[in-house]
Curated annotation (Swiss-Prot):
Belongs to the transferase hexapeptide repeat family. LpxD subfamily. Signal peptide: none annotated. The keyword Kinase does not apply. It comes from Arabidopsis thaliana (Mouse-ear cress). This is Probable UDP-3-O-acylglucosamine N-acyltransferase 2, mitochondrial. The lineage of its organism: Eukaryota, Viridiplantae, Streptophyta, Embryophyta, Tracheophyta.
Amino acid sequence: MAATLWRLYSKSICNSLQGIILNKPFIQKQLLLSSRTRSLSFSSDSQFGSATAEVCSNTGLKTGGGIIVKEGFLRWENGGGTCHSSAQIYSSALVEFGAVVHEKAVLGAEVHVGSGTVIGPSVDIGPSTRIGYNVSISNCSIGDSCVIHNGVCIGQDGFGFYVDEHGNMVKKPQTLNVKIGNRVEIGANTCIDRGSWRETVIEDDTKIDNLVQIGHNVIIGKCCLLCGQVGIAGSVTIGDYVALGGRAAVRDHVSIVSKVRLAANSCVTRNITEPGDFGGFPAVPIHEWRKQIVRAQIANKREI
């Protein structure tokens, strides 16, 4: 950075620019955007290409800012990742080498993006969110202080097809987004599909284990717990404080009210309208499920 500024100074590119750079910090550390920002841009030659940057005064937000590595993409100075020149990234955000941030993405203050991660166009990530390695995020907004573990995929198309009048398999359009609230944690290799007729939503403080599948148009309330290998089909609505045990399944287009606990390996095939504990296939109130198990053991002359 010092060498670049010195070359700008020695070549006398712009006298007014010299005064701005020498008398003001290059990046101010404020976290809030100002509607009265003004832009400062500069360029200089380098052995890797032309270095370009655009800095908004009165804010820590920055677009561009590094060595050009491909048309429209720059090497981000904090971590060495590759970022599109139109992406808006706070100077305190860390984008590790090997990560890619696409056009018009927004990364808030103190965001950490791990190597191999791809942040798609127009993705919005809130402050202090940590994203692991080899994550794919597209068509999505993520709130503050979230944790996204390695291998997560968010915002890809949901599984929607139909057979037309000619017998051809046709894909249903998947055009909406995923909206993730604040302080959400998503375990490794979990997949969350984008919406088709409504957004896929995960509300604040929900925690999701590894290897969970969440289909398109699903709405999950706040403070829910989803254990490993849970599968939720499309267009499901889940209330607040719901806990789904490991390998539990929920069929499409059903609703689960708040404060429900579902036992491991259970399957919800119809709406659950009252809070409580449920289990079995199909899921029923837990005491009924236990009676079913006892009857089955007696019928088969097994010891209880």
